[in-house]
């Protein structure tokens, strides 16, 4: 509905787009908005969309008036940045409404197909000043992806303030992470939340391949009495990565961290909630690629009612999980 009501612009940036049913529904809306005079830009990662779209996908979008750019196209020659992928997921509508989360624009994310059992993902819809941060993140990547001059002479035209009646207490702060600036923002947010936890710290992540620093922070939190839990998938999308993920279990479990595997299928959500007071949701997996190699984004929430919604979602998810220690699977590389 938000896209259908767009009046000025729609910006969409995703790691993967699949040229199938889920995307076709969105594309129909985008084409209708273009006909109504709305500026539409679509930006996707080339490697993330390999096998999902044809080589002429971007050209077809351009032919119907949708501006399209592809991030870091794959080529057979040497590319020192090949490993740096755009893993962000952002939609901005008129600068008034923004979306981010774990989902890409493909059938499995909408549970139209079920290659790995049920698919669980999460996202955040936001209004107000926070949307401006998503707009800036999108435009920076869009302009960096081309040697041409920026499409906009003045970025401020997309950053105009809009009247907004606050619906939540507290605040939300979107943030972006880049592998090129020497700052590991995603990891620093996670570790900061772990270190501030007093009662509980719960994570959901599709992969668990962490640095010694993060493993140490999780273990210390558990040892000081914090209820530390991590939810991972019960059905893997990549068996090798699943084995590596499970290899990290034992070192955490023996220090008091509880691991849960979601039995209905694959949980692709990336969330953390702490002490009913703060949470984060976005694109950042608890793995080395997300934390060090990819362009990522997330949103930090503090003092918002939605923090409790996230806790309740994690509680419901845990009710459908197997407790790894109880199943005596800690440290096994099945």
Give the ranges of each region predicted by the language model.
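Charged, low-complexity intrinsically disordered terminal segments
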Residues: 1-334
């Amino acid at each position: 509905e938000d896209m259908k009501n767009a009046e000025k612009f729609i910006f969409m940036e995703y790691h993967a787009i699949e040229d199938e049913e889920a995307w076709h529904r969105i594309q129909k809306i985008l084409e209708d908005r273009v006909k109504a005079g709305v500026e539409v830009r679509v930006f996707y990662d080339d490697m993330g969309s390999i096998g999902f779209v044809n080589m002429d996908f971007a050209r077809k979008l351009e032919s119907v008036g949708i501006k399209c750019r592809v991030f870091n196209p794959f080529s057979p020659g040497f590319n020192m940045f090949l490993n740096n992928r755009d893993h962000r997921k952002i939609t901005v509508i008129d600068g008034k409404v923004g979306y981010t989360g774990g989902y890409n624009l493909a059938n499995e994310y909408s549970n139209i197909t079920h290659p790995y059992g049920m698919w669980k993902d999460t996202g955040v819809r936001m209004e107000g000043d926070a949307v401006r941060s998503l707009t800036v993140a999108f435009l920076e990547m869009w302009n960096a992806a081309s040697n041409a001059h920026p499409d906009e002479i003045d970025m401020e035209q997309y950053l105009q303030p809009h009247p907004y009646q606050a619906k939540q207490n507290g605040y939300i702060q979107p943030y972006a992470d880049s592998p090129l600036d020497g700052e590991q923002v995603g990891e620093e947010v996670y570790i900061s939340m772990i270190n501030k936890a007093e009662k509980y710290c719960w994570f959901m992540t599709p992969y668990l391949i962490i640095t010694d620093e993060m493993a140490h922070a999780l273990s210390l939190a558990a040892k000081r009495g914090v209820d530390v839990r991590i939810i991972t998938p019960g059905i893997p999308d990549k068996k090798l990565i699943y084995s590596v993920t499970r290899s990290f279990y034992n070192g955490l479990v023996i220090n008091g961290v509880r691991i849960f595997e979601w039995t209905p299928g694959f949980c692709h959500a990336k969330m953390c909630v702490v002490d009913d007071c703060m949470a984060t949701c976005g694109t950042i997996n608890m793995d080395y690629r997300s934390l060090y190699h990819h362009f990522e984004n997330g949103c930090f929430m503090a003092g918002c009612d939605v923090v409790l919604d996230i806790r309740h979602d994690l509680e419901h998810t845990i009710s459908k999980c197997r407790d790894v220690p109880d199943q005596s699977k800690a440290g096994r590389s099945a």
